[in-house]
Amino acid sequence: MTLQKPKGTQDILPQETVKWQYVENVARKTFKKYHYGEIRTPMFERYEVISRSVGDTTDIVTKEMYDFHDKGDRHITLRPEGTAPVVRSYVENKLFAPEVQKPVKVFYIGSMFRYERPQAGRLREFHQLGVECFGSNNPAIDAETIAMAYQLFNELGIKDVTLHLNSLGNKESRKAYRQALIDYLIPMKDKLSKDSQRRLEENPLRVLDSKEKEDKEAVENAPSILDYLDDDSQAHFQGVRDMLEVLDIPYVIDTNMVRGLDYYNHTIFEFITQVDKSELTLCAGGRYDSLVEYFGGPATAGFGFGLGLERLLLVIDKQKINLPVDNSLDVYIAVLGAAANSTALELIQAIRKQGFSAERDYLSRKIKAQFKSADVFKTKLIMTLGESEVETGQVAVKNNFTRQEIAVSFEEIKTDFASVFKQLGSDRP
């Protein structure tokens, strides 16, 4: 039997990981500008951390979670999303304490797991960038966090992304809207999908989020949640909209958007783009002002978003964006004969210690094959080391692009390779 990776997973090979690393580094730099620090939480959590916070009736919990009992009979789940683990960590580590500066801003990058049908940009193990901000209910936080995602897309050169915006209001507003939605949907219950018939009993707002054709038709003329917002909820949402306009970030109001997680209130948003004539959600998030309290902490406002790396890279590929990744090699040493083997290793280590990337031949190949490898690696400088070079203590170093060549002593290579690099038309990396 041939052993293969599990369905819905992928091997990310070196020629692709450089793109991932570039995107992750751009994200880190962008988040740092907004004073976010990185947090790393376990890849698995107690089942209740996810089920109770995300919602027992959500598709994530009822259909998509990877959960199991470990050898100590503890109910464990691989994390399907990043917010609940971060909130658990915020409470467990008492980041709400008065000595901790507020708001607390953190970001994470890591694997998430959901059992769903694999397709382009959607895998069972996927990678997510996410941010969470704790300690302020100021609508400026909502607008700033949305602006940060918008800036990240701009930094990466991604175009044609539309911001969809909605408000779920506070608890009282949602309660009033929930009843209005039930009253609207009950007469057409038999026309809904089986899942939405169940949702109507458990959490009717979920029907708005259904992708089934019959459900979309049913909610086309559903009442708008914006008509049920109380004064405080309206003021908060208007504040967010006003600030987005100040920041010149265009948006559309999408009253059917509810998000797939139960902990949201007030502002929710998605950045959506088109891929092969289909809508693709690139980034989504919102406000969750009761989640910290739910985990046993004090009442604390929260706002954040999650962004799928696979989807982001898919859009970058579809939009033919050339990421400025550098796979080139500074130095390649072609090695001729056993007499040069030890010296080649000594020189290449000295070059690396001075901050340069370097590679050499280890396979005793013919010189033509070694030069071909240097070209494949997009090598800037090449040196050929054989028995005569070892005897004289110097070697010819050649610019692989201009063909300029100089003779350099081993001692200079070991102590000041930067000057050699510069003489041949390159600057220190």
UniProtKB/Swiss-Prot annotation:
InterPro entries: aa-tRNA-synth_II, aa-tRNA-synth_II/BPL/LPL, Anticodon-bd, Anticodon-bd_dom_sf, His-tRNA-ligase, HisRS-like_core, HisRS/HisZ, HisRS_anticodon. It is an enzyme of class 6 (ligase). Keywords: Aminoacyl-tRNA synthetase, ATP-binding, Cytoplasm, Ligase, Nucleotide-binding, Protein biosynthesis. One of its GO terms (molecular function) is ATP binding. It is found in: Cytoplasm. GO terms for biological process: histidyl-tRNA aminoacylation. SUPFAM superfamilies: Class II aaRS ABD-related (SSF52954), Class II aaRS and biotin synthetases (SSF55681). PROSITE patterns: AA_TRNA_LIGASE_II. The keyword Plastid does not apply. It catalyses: tRNA(His) + L-histidine + ATP = L-histidyl-tRNA(His) + AMP + diphosphate + H(+). Its EC number is 6.1.1.21. GO terms for cellular component: cytoplasm. Pfam families: HGTP_anticodon, tRNA-synt_His. Belongs to the class-II aminoacyl-tRNA synthetase family. HAMAP family: His_tRNA_synth. NCBIfam families: hisS. Homodimer. This is Histidine--tRNA ligase. It comes from Streptococcus mutans serotype c (strain ATCC 700610 / UA159). The gene is hisS.
